Swiss-Prot record:
It is found in: Cytoplasm. It holds the Pfam family PRC_RimM. This is Ribosome maturation factor RimM. Residues 100-176 form the PRC barrel domain. Binds ribosomal protein uS19. An accessory protein needed during the final step in the assembly of 30S ribosomal subunit, possibly for assembly of the head region. Essential for efficient processing of 16S rRNA. May be needed both before and after RbfA during the maturation of 16S rRNA. It has affinity for free ribosomal 30S subunits but not for 70S ribosomes. Belongs to the RimM family. It comes from the Bacteria. GO terms for molecular function: ribosome binding. It comes from Prochlorococcus marinus (strain MIT 9515).
């Protein structure tokens, strides 16, 4: 299990790319150098400890939020295939400092989701995933029925985020939370 106090998930390994061990990674980061600048990187499968790998190179796929990267240790497609589903991590103490009202998207994971109802804040669920291939969407698991809903990550719908106290407030338009 990933310890979110020590590690920040910055990408998801989705598939091999070609036959020479290149890997396609879905970015969860605004910092492209995490996928392009050579150096040490960490990967982890949910049930394992993080593994250290040496990033040799990487480039962004045109018009996409995904990158194709090359690790020194991964020599062929079969080895790359075994990494499908792994998460690309950075140590929390290596995260660039952000301005006051900025945060990393992955910091939204596991935040409680609140809604204003009868002038009181009510917890309705929690953030369980992020979808950002085309648009940033939060995957919220509702407490009432255990269903997951996609909520666009826009100021009009999510006017307040409190990372320190681990919650966000949503003002969904009618029907957004209904399945």
């Amino acid at each position: 299990m990933i310890n979110h106090d020590e590690w920040l998930i910055v990408g998801l390994i989705t598939s091999p790319q070609g036959i020479n061990g290149k890997i396609k990674v879905k970015s969860l980061s605004d910092f492209e150098e995490r996928f392009t600048k050579p150096g040490i990187r960490w990967i982890q499968k949910e049930t394992e400890s993080p593994k250290k790998l040496q990033l040799i190179s990487g480039f962004q796929k045109p018009g996409k939020e995904s990158f194709v990267i090359t690790f020194k240790e991964i020599k062929n497609r079969n080895e790359a295939e075994k990494l499908k589903g792994y998460k690309l991590l950075v140590k929390v103490d290596e995260i660039p400092k952000l301005n006051k009202n900025e945060f990393h998207l992955t910091e939204l994971m596991n935040l409680k989701v609140k809604i204003l109802e009868n002038n009181k804040l009510k917890i309705i669920g929690k953030v369980v995933n992020l979808e950002n291939e085309k648009n940033n969407l939060l995957v919220i698991k509702l407490l009432t029925n255990d269903k997951e809903v996609l909520v666009p990550f826009v100021k009009e719908i999510i006017p307040e985020i409190d990372i320190k106290n681990k919650f966000l407030i949503i003002t969904p338009p009618p029907g957004l939370l209904e399945l």
